[in-house]
Every structure is written in C-alpha cells, then in structure tokens.
C-alpha cells in the first residue's frame, strides 16, 4: 500500500478538511472496474482562498483577464483576494439561459439547500442521474428525479458523489447506482453558518461538474468546468485532452482509463516504477540547485512534499527555479511567485494534466493537484451564511 501524506487546511480560522498527497492522491483502481481513481483515493477539502463570483454578483475582488500558462482556451476573471473568510470574487462570464436554475428551492431547515441540475444535454434523464451522501448516521442515495434537492446539515470533510446509471449501454448498471463506472464527486465542510467546498480534479475527471454557491448577503461564486466543456460531448472532451497535452500525458485519457476517466498523472505512468517516474527530475535538480535547498528531494510525481505546498506547486507549475525563490529549508521567499499565472506551465516539465483543467475551468480555476490552492487558483470557495448550492452534472 502506498504511503499517504495528509495535511489539514484552514480557512476562516478553522480546519475545513484534508488534502491527500503523493502516490495516494490517485487512489487505487476504482471499485467498479473503472480503470481509474476510486472514491476513497483522493483529496478531501483542501483549503485555500479563491473562487469567483457569478456574473452580476457583488464582487469583493477585481476581475482581470489573467491566463493560466497561456494554455489554449484559458483565461477569464481571476480575482484578487476577497474579504476575509470568503473566496475571492471575479467574473464568471455568462452561462446559457436557464443553466443555473435556482427556482423552487425552499428555505433550509438545516444549514443550506443543495439543488442538483441535469446538464447532460439530453443524453440522460433525471431518473438516470443519482447523488449519494454519507456522513455519520446519514446515508442518502437518490435519483435527481426522486429528490432534486437536499437539506444539508453541518458536517465535516464530506463528499457527495454523483453517478450515471441508465438502463442501456454505455452506462448500464443494475440495482445499485453507486456501482456505476461513471461517477464524480464534490467536497465540503459545512459549519452551522459556514460553507467551505470545492470541485476537484486531483484524482481524475469522471463527469463534468460545476457548482454555484449563493449566500444570504448576496455573495455568489461559481466554479467547475466551463460552459464550452459542458456544451460539448464526452467524446469531444476526451479527444480535446489528448490533443492539448504533450505525449507523456496523452495516455491518461486513453484505455484502460477511458472511457470512464481521465486520471491524474500519479495514477498513470508518472507513479513510482512508471515510464514517466523521472519526468520532473531535471527541473527538481534545477530548482534545488538555484535556491540551495537542503531538504530531501521529492519522489516520483512530486511525492513527499506534504509540508511544502509552495515547493509542490512550483514543481507542477514549472516556476521558482531561480535564486531567491525559496529558502534553503524549502519555504517560499519570493512572495510574488504566484502573482502571474501566465508564467505557470510555460514550458516542460510541468503538470499539463492540471493545466488542461485550468484552461477549461470557469475563471481559469481548477483543483488539478493537491496544492493547487497555493496562490488561490483552485476551485475552493468559502463564505458565511450559505443559502443554497447548485450542482450541475454533465456528461
């Protein structure tokens, strides 16, 4: 069994969840023969700051036209940090009319309401889509048709799973929808008056996911796959990944992982013993040498840096390999290192899996690796007095 490195991440003064690092971030093969990361293998609710507001929402950060590493289709409204305890707000652009349907949401009796939106472009009915949530004594699994909303209580380090389970190929499953090979999830920690959560691509892509948080003070934040990704077919998304990433990463979206998942590099050839296990070695040597870093170098796919989130992010984003970026003990020295995302992923070696999800994420944000929250570029959002969360699930 691979060794897992776990860190607690804090926001607004309390722990919001766990982020799993290294070889375990990809998890073992999925329990349903999915050829990819299984539900128990990934990151929890890693902290960070950021998020971006929906169009027309009151914004506490200024919108900008920042580009993540110049990747095709990237850009969008990255924002400056928002108010304390909240995700930064920026421009999310306009989704198709009716995409974010917030009608018929009753007031919550617990903390907040969740509403589930079928955005599979007619591929599946609400009876074919399922959500599942388990926490303590809670165990709920329902189709979107049966229960399109859920009154969410306070809970810590929670995951809500989404499944496609239709009576015919290619996603046929019988009896238990949670045995479907086509699934994905969101993560959250919800306090009595606080929402903290994110979409994630740390483990893999399984289904298109986006979510919009609405709070009592009018704050809104929207994160996840962008409108163009939701509009295209599943085959097109897989083909686009293969077309846009370098040769070393193409197999992540091909069999045996496809058609079920696009897996993170550590679940593919970048793991220990894999054909790309030494992919980052030359850059790591440069980064360590330029900064006189004395801590141990990471293992394959950057594993072993649980206590050094900035170093981890630097390796995956291909930055920081100049003197003055880090202290000898591996701590960030150049506080401006994360200010310009156009410098990220600019040349190899870099985590082009993560870059792809940033390029096709709302506002250029994604959770493409465990410490993608460094610099507020992840899909993590946090705000007080949440009223509802809209979750869009696509195919």
Question: Model-derived features: where do they sit?
Answer:
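Ser/Thr-rich, Pro/Gly/Ala-heavy low-complexity intrinsically disordered linkers and tails
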Residues: 16-96
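Extracellular low-complexity, O-glycosylation-prone Ser/Thr/Pro/Gly-rich "stalks"
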Residues: 96-395
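Secreted/extracellular small peptides and ectodomain modules produced from precursors
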Residues: 2, 22-24, 82, 171, ...
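Sec-dependent bacterial lipoprotein signal peptides
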Residues: 1-22
């Amino acid at each position: 069994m691979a060794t897992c490195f776990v860190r607690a991440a804090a926001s607004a003064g309390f722990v919001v969840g766990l982020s799993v690092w290294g070889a375990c971030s990809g998890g073992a093969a999925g329990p349903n023969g999915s050829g990819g990361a299984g539900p128990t293998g990934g990151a929890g609710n890693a902290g960070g700051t950021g998020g971006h507001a929906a169009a027309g929402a009151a914004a506490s950060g200024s919108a900008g036209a920042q580009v993540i590493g110049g990747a095709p289709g990237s850009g969008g409204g990255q924002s400056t940090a928002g108010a304390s305890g909240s995700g930064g707000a920026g421009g999310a652009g306009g989704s198709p009319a009716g995409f974010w349907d917030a009608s018929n949401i009753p007031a919550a009796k617990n903390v907040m309401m969740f509403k589930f939106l079928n955005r599979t472009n007619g591929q599946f009915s609400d009876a074919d889509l399922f959500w599942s949530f388990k926490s303590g004594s809670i165990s709920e699994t329902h189709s979107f048709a049966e229960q399109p909303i859920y009154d969410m209580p306070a809970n810590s380090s929670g995951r809500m799973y989404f499944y496609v389970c239709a009576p015919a190929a290619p996603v046929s499953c019988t009896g238990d929808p949670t045995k479907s090979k086509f699934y994905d999830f969101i993560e959250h920690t919800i306090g009595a008056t606080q929402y903290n959560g994110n979409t994630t691509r740390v483990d893999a892509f399984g289904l298109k996911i986006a979510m919009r948080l609405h709070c009592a003070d009018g704050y809104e934040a929207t994160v996840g796959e962008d409108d163009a990704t939701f509009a295209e077919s599943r085959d097109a998304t897989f083909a686009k990944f293969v077309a846009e990433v370098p040769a070393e990463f193409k197999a992540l979206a091909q069999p045996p992982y496809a058609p079920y998942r696009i897996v993170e590099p550590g679940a593919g050839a970048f793991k220990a013993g894999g054909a790309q296990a030494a992919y980052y070695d030359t850059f790591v040597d440069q980064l360590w040498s330029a900064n006189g870093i004395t801590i141990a170098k990471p293992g394959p796919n950057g594993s072993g840096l649980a206590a050094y989130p900035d170093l981890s992010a630097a390796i995956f984003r291909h930055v920081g390999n100049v003197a003055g970026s880090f202290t000898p003990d591996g701590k960030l020295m150049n506080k401006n290192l994360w200010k310009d995302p156009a410098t990220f992923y600019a040349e190899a070696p870099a985590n082009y899996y993560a870059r792809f999800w940033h390029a096709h994420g709302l506002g250029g944000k994604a959770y493409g690796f465990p410490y993608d929250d460094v610099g507020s570029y992840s899909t993590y959002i946090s705000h007080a007095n949440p009223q509802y969360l809209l979750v869009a699930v696509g195919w």
